[in-house]
Amino acid sequence: MERVNDSALNRLLTPLMRRVRLMLARAVVNVINDGRKVQNLQVGLLDDEESDEVERLQNYGHFSVPLPGAEALIACVGAQRDQGIAVVVEDRRYRPTNLEPGDAGIYHHEGHRIRLTKDGRCIITCKTVEVYADESMTVDTPRTTFTGDVEIQKGLGVKGKSQFDSNITAPDAIINGKSTDKHIHRGDSGGTTGPMQ
């Protein structure tokens, strides 16, 4: 068997190694186009190389729009730099740190987040929570605590007992079909009582 010298082997392997090196690249996100069916990125690669129309594939049911300056891992199909796909986009500037093993969640660069932790806890941290439901909403829990004021803008139906440890303020209360504001009854010395004062 004839021995291949090192320089001949290097000449054979160099083009192959170059293509392997071109298959994956680190990149910095410059521009995001979220108006298409598949999100497109313009990214800066190594050595001042820019790549437009890089498709960013996201898991079904999940979405995000990265900020300029986020980092990406680009896979180039067939080692062709014009066939890039962003397989991972991360932003170390805003990623929550010092989490516990097993924690998972969603975060936003402004600081609000949903965090799933051990012992079945879901912690939502934000300024405002808005829930829009076309039909109904059910909260099924043995106990609910509100630590601030609660405002109900429409009717309230209570099927269980109610306990109040402070005053109730209302223009009128209807109890057993009778108005506490306009209710009168016979007085103990004849006549009728006036409305409640």
Curated annotation (Swiss-Prot):
Transmembrane helix among the record's keywords? Answer: no
Q: Where is the composition biased (Basic and acidic residues)?
A: 179-188
Q: Which GO terms describe its cellular component?
A: host cell cytoplasm; virus tail, baseplate
The knockout note for this entry states: No tail is synthesized.
Q: Which segments does the entry list as coiled coil?
A: none
- GO biological process assignments: symbiont genome ejection through host cell envelope, contractile tail mechanism; viral tail assembly
Q: Which residues form the signal peptide?
A: none
Annotated cofactor note: Binds 1 Ca(2+) cation per trimer. Ca(2+) plays an important role in interaction with the host cell membrane.
- What is expression of this protein induced or repressed by? Expressed in the late phase of the viral replicative cycle. Expression of late genes is activated by the viral late transcription activator C.
Q: Which cofactor does it need?
A: Ca(2+); chloride; Fe cation
Residue sites binding Fe cation per the record: H183, H185
Give me the segments passing through the membrane. none
Gene3D superfamilies cross-referenced by the UniProt entry: 2.20.25.540, 6.20.170.10
Compartments in which it is found: Virion; Host cytoplasm
Q: Where are the annotated segments for Disordered?
A: 172-197
Any one GO molecular function term:
metal ion binding
Q: Which UniProt keywords apply?
A: Calcium, Chloride, Host cytoplasm, Iron, Late protein, Metal-binding, Viral baseplate protein, Viral contractile tail ejection system, Viral genome ejection through host cell envelope, Viral penetration into host cytoplasm, Viral release from host cell, Viral tail assembly, Viral tail protein, Virion, Virus entry into host cell
Chain positions recorded as chloride binding sites: D188
Question: Per UniProt, where does Ca(2+) bind?
Answer: D188, S189
Q: How does it assemble?
A: Homotrimer. Part of a complex composed of three DNA circularization protein N, three baseplate hub protein gp44 and three sub-complex wedge (made of two copies of each baseplate protein gp46, gp47 and gp48) that forms the baseplate.
Function description: Component of the baseplate that forms a central needlelike spike used to puncture the host cell membrane for tube insertion during virus entry. Probably involved in baseplate and tail assembly. Serves as the distal plug of tail tube channel and might regulate the process of the phage DNA and protein ejection into the host cell.
NCBIfam families for this protein: phage_P2_V
Comment on protein domains? The C-terminus is a needlelike shaped homotrimer consisting of an intertwined beta-sheet, a triple beta-helix and a metal-binding region.
> What protein is this chain from?
Baseplate puncturing device gp45
Per the UniProt record, the source organism is Escherichia phage Mu (Bacteriophage Mu)
